[in-house]
Structure formats: C-alpha cells, structure tokens
Amino acid sequence: MRKLLKPVKDVGIVGYGAYVPKYRIKAEEIGRVWGVSSFPIEEKAVPGLDEDALTIGIEAARNALKRARIDPKLIRAVWFGSESKPYAVKPTGTVIAEAIGATPDVSTADFEFACKAGTEALQTAIGFVGSGMADYAMAIGADTAQGRPGDHLEFTAGAGGAAFIVGEKSSETVAYFEGSYSYVTDTPDFWRRQHEHYPRHGNRFTGEPAYFHHIINAAKTLMEELGLTVNDFDYAVFHQPNVKFPLTVAKILGIPKEKVLPGLLTGIIGNTYSGATMVGVSAVLDIAKPGDRILWVSFGSGAGSDAFSIVVQDAIEEKRDLAPKTMDYVNRKKYIDYALYAKARRKYIM
C-alpha cells in the first residue's frame, strides 16, 4: 500500500510568516513562586492583555501575505489550527480571513488536534491546492497555551504562531513539498474536557507511547517512502514541548543536533503548541539556502504526527526580507514578573 501523501499537482510555500508576543517570563521567576529550582526551558513568551491565538494568527497571516505578494482575494481557503481559540462556538478562521481581505469567496474552518492542529490544516491546504480546487490556501497554527498553576506545564506553555500560504510549485514558491505522511493512533496522553480551564496529562503515556512513538514512525515512514535518509536533510524541525524531547528524537534517528538547533525555539519562547513546528520552520526558512532540504515532523496529543519533506527554492533569497523574520520577534523582549503574568493569563479568579 502506498503510504506517501502526494497531491496530483506539485505544490509549495508561496509565503510564510510568524509572530511571537514580546512579553517574557523567566522560568526562574515561575520557580520562585512554586519553590522549584530546576527548569525545562529558560523563558517563555506571554501574550499581552489584548492578544490571543486569533490576534497572533492575524499577525502571522499578514506576514505570510507580505512574502507571498499576492492579492488576498486569490486565497480560497483560510484554515486555522489551535487548541486555545478564543471562541468555543464561532469560527476563528472567518475573523482572520476578513482581517486579511480574503472574504467572501473563501472557505474557512478551525482545526483541532492538540499541538498538530496547524499541520493538519497544512495537510488539507496541500490537498486543496494540489487537486486544482484553488490557486492558494492558507494554513495557520497558533496558540496561547495554558498550564495549571504550579504544574510543570506552566513552565513551558508559551505563545506564538505561524502561517503558510500554499500554491502550485513555481518560481514564486520559496520551498516545495516532496511529500507528506500522517501517523495516528488513539493514545490518551493529554486532554482537556469541556468547561475545564486547564489540561490534564496521562503521565505514563506522555513520552514513549505518545511523542516518541508517533514522531519517529512518521519520520521513518516518510523517508522510506521518498527513498531518503537522514543524511539527505540539511535541517530537521520536530515538535518541541521542551528542549530535551526533540534532541532525543534527533539522536535516535541519527541526526546531528546542529541540524535541529536552528528551528528549536522552545527554550526561549516556550511550547507554542499548534505553532511549535510551524514557527520553527519559519525560523529555518529565514536562514536556509536554495536546495536545502528540511524534515518537518509535528506531534499532537491524542495522538498523531504529520511529517513533511520540503526543499528550499531560489525565491527564498528575495522573499525572506519582505516581512519581519522569526528571530526579530524572538529577540524583541519585555520581561514581566509572575503577578503580571498571572494577570495576563487570567489565572486570577475574581
């Protein structure tokens, strides 16, 4: 059975963009409050009082449009992936589509699959454009993740997102998709029930049965189907709930950490959930050279992974400077203390 996912028409990334809020809190500051002295990351991004997954998605989408240099009316789909969208009943995609000027001739939907909701939207965009149904489609992954006060997730749950505009492969695409593959099972490693404010995690399922099993199987199957090895890739971006997990995956697969570090941002902005690998790939595209090949593997609890192989094209040299680069946002910082952080994240119950 053919496992590789590849559309009828070759497609690529016409434009991409990321956004990370400027506020930061040091892991040490969170640890001070809860009496913890060892931390999985250095610091994380915190959304401002007027920011949420929707506003992050809009900023990322606008940056993607700047690089794409296309009329937003040509975008026939705006698909938004998040597990922290601001409305329980009301699509976020419609607001983003309106904000960027893509309405009314456009399909919109909100995708959910924990931390791989954004790449799930991307898989759909690839198929939508690759089938000939549309010239362009936009996929966005963004989150303002929450962690229960004092829980280890509070140290890593960050904020940020990225958007990718998919179009038919041409001289205008900054990178093209060689193929993709999705690997999914029913694994209860992480969940949040309706009306609950904070997620829960099934500790014994978190590592090996969920994250490592799915990412490694997705990566290996994609490479086997494409006839590639780890040596054929110049960069690798894996889902990054922390710094340790993606580096462990790289070691298991035999990928030098030097190929992983450029897209590994969790240590300085936190885990951006649906935005994690998408923000990482945007950072890699900001520095990659034409001909570079990128291995991109997401993970979403519940559980599943999407794996992509993309090859950078000549257009990247011109387009990368048309919008703020990912590290421009990462390096733009304003530190806050735990009291302001708790206020911004609405942890105070009045």
Swiss-Prot record:
A molecular function (GO) term: acetyl-CoA C-acetyltransferase activity
Residues annotated as catalytic: E83 (proton donor/acceptor), C115 (acyl-thioester intermediate), H239 (proton donor/acceptor)
Acyltransferase is among the record's keywords: yes
Assembly, per entry: Interacts with acetoacetyl-CoA thiolase that catalyzes the precedent step in the pathway and with a DUF35 protein. The acetoacetyl-CoA thiolase/HMG-CoA synthase complex channels the intermediate via a fused CoA-binding site, which allows for efficient coupling of the endergonic thiolase reaction with the exergonic HMGCS reaction.
EC assignment: 2.3.3.10
Keyword terms of this UniProt record: Acyltransferase, Isoprene biosynthesis, Transferase
Record bears the keyword Transferase: yes
Listed Gene3D superfamilies: 3.40.47.10
Domain of life: Archaea
Chain's role: Catalyzes the condensation of acetyl-CoA with acetoacetyl-CoA to form 3-hydroxy-3-methylglutaryl-CoA (HMG-CoA). Functions in the mevalonate (MVA) pathway leading to isopentenyl diphosphate (IPP), a key precursor for the biosynthesis of isoprenoid compounds that are building blocks of archaeal membrane lipids.
Protein name as it appears in the record: Hydroxymethylglutaryl-CoA synthase
Recorded family membership: Belongs to the thiolase-like superfamily. Archaeal HMG-CoA synthase family.
One biological process term in Gene Ontology: farnesyl diphosphate biosynthetic process, mevalonate pathway
TM spans (from-to): none
Binding site for CoA: R204, K244
